[in-house]
């Protein structure tokens, strides 16, 4: 197998290293002004390369201040069927495109996205409330996925292998049950399934959307893509992906963009027998419901799903507490806790718990909350009313059953968005909030005395996405590495305890209730999930 010569984009890091932070801020601020000029426009769906309107629209507002971002088509089941038919028709052509050409197209897409990175990042910040640093990092990740998967496809020669006649003769010379046999010419190839429905989340509408979509398309499948279109709307970033794919030369019909309620458009993608596979990132309940609707009805599909997390970290008595505080704060409160990899519970040895809490509260108090477009703001708004309600209800339960150590209040910013303080609390491990995914900036601190008990509690949830440890003790590191039930494990990582996977370096994979296939994004095994293996043997006379 050839080598994948891949390097990460790392835009902000490069600007800092070159002493150009002011230039970075200028480019981002200009892109924001440009993006706002387009606010209030009406947008189309794209099916088979054609603009399609639904007759009614969805109004998308920025979570920052309630400004109308745009009006998007309120697609129906019929529009989903149209998109599936268009994708199915194009599949007959796209699957036969040489893998080298497919790789070239998505390398071009990475280049086009890189040329537009600030414009796309600005739209992303306005649409879901991320800071400029998180937004540019997410666009970088989309670029990385495109280049990495192109490299993997090339390194694996399109996932096809042929057995030479001489090798075949050696293997089958004895034949079956000792009987003589002629040599066989054998080809083993991974073939695309067909049409994939890609159902994207609000929290990473660029990087995850690109990773899922390109995983399907680069391996020869076609896509019907539905961005988050209901409570948490991120439809404009999805449209930008569609537009940039076209600019990169992707044939019409390979990527079809539809918007509309999940109860109609999303459900049709799941139940329609013309869809051969589903790629989904979202809640566990939604993911399991999809599986029930398909496999339960005898409608088998390929399912590649990531279904959230309830991610733990352990802070040992042997930890560097400053590193632990830094990593815990970033993982728990970055993007207001609205990441599937966000840290939501931390188990701290009793001997250092009070010092850890004191240091954590001190650093948390310094975080600025407000308009994430401002360069000094760390925590922006919650994405929706439902997220705000979940935060308030959780704080009430903490006050009833535990101890609220810091935060828990709404924040007045002068904007119409939903802004809240990061909260730090103590609860018993058995409490429901310790086991339930919340997707808000609430961190539960739980003390422990025995390291084995800490690992046991960390594993005592339905999820298994990410986990972190802070310890300088080799025995504890070994015990944690061997015993933790999570697909992404970080040890002594000051930058973040549980978030921040880097394409090509870390795989991002969910165990237990967090995933299904056991293979993760940004890894050498991801693309294989979008294909099925076939062995073809031709006996030589």
Where in the sequence are the language-model features?
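ALDH superfamily catalytic-core signature
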Residues: 244-247, 277, 285-429, 456-457, ...
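Residue-level signal for inorganic ion chemistry
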Residues: 66, 87, 102, 124, ...
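Structural signal for hydrophobic packing residues in well-ordered secondary-structure cores
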Residues: 91, 95, 110-117, 121, ...
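Residues at or immediately preceding the N-termini of alpha-helices
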Residues: 63, 77-80, 99, 117, ...
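Hydrophobic face of amphipathic alpha-helices that form TPR/SEL1-like repeat modules
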Residues: 1-69
């Amino acid at each position: 197998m050839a080598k994948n010569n891949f390097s990460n984009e790392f835009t902000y890091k490069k600007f800092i290293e070159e002493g150009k932070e002011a230039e970075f801020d200028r480019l981002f601020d200009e892109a924001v002004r440009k993006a706002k000029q387009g606010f209030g426009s009406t947008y189309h769906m794209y099916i088979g390369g054609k603009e399609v309107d639904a007759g009614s629209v969805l109004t998308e507002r920025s979570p920052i201040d309630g400004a109308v971002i745009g009006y998007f088509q309120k697609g129906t089941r019929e529009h989903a069927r149209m998109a599936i038919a268009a994708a199915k028709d194009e599949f007959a052509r796209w699957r036969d495109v040489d893998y080298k050409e497919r790789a070239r197209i998505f390398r071009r897409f990475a280049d086009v996205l890189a040329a537009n990175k600030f414009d796309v990042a600005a739209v992303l910040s306005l649409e879901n409330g991320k800071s400029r640093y998180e937004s540019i990092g997410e666009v970088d990740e989309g670029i990385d996925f495109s280049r990495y998967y192109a490299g993997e496809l090339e390194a694996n020669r399109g996932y096809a292998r042929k057995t030479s006649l001489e090798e075949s003769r050696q293997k089958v010379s004895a034949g079956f049950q000792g009987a003589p046999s002629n040599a066989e010419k054998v080809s083993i190839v991974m073939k695309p399934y067909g049409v994939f429905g890609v159902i994207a989340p609000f929290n990473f509408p660029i990087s995850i959307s690109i990773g899922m979509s390109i995983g399907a398309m680069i391996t020869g499948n076609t896509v019907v893509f539905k961005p988050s279109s209901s409570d948490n709307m991120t439809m404009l970033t999805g449209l930008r992906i569609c537009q940039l794919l076209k600019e990169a030369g992707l044939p019409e019909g390979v990527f079809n963009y539809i918007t509309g309620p999940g109860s109609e458009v999303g459900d049709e993608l799941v139940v329609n027998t013309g869809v051969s596979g589903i790629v989904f990132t979202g809640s566990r309940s939604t993911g399991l419901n999809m599986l029930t609707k398909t496999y339960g009805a005898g409608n088998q599909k390929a399912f590649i799903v990531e279904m959230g997390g309830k991610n733990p970290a352990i802070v040992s008595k042997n930890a560097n507490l400053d590193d632990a505080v830094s990593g815990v704060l970033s993982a728990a409160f970055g993007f207001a806790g609205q990441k599937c990899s966000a840290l939501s519970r931390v188990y701290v040895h009793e001997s250092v718990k009070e010092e850890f809490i004191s240091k954590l509260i001190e650093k948390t108090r310094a975080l600025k909350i407000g308009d994430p477009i401002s360069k000094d703001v760390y925590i922006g708004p919650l994405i929706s009313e439902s997220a705000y309600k979940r935060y308030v209800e959780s704080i009430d339960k903490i006050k009833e059953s535990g101890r609220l150590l810091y935060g828990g209040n709404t924040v007045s910013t002068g904007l119409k968005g939903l802004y809240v303080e990061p909260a730090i609390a103590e609860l018993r491990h058995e409490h429901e909030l310790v086991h339930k995914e919340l997707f808000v900036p609430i961190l539960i601190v739980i003390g422990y005395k025995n390291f084995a008990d800490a690992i046991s509690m960390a594993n005592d949830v339905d999820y298994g996405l990410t986990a972190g440890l802070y310890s300088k003790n080799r025995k504890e590191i070994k015990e944690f590495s061997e015993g933790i039930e999570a697909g992404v494990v970080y040890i002594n990582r000051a930058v973040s305890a549980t978030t921040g996977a880097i394409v090509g370096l870390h795989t991002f994979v969910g165990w237990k209730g967090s995933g299904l296939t056991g293979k993760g994004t940004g890894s050498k095994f991801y693309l294989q999930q979008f294909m099925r293996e076939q062995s073809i043997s031709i006996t030589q006379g």
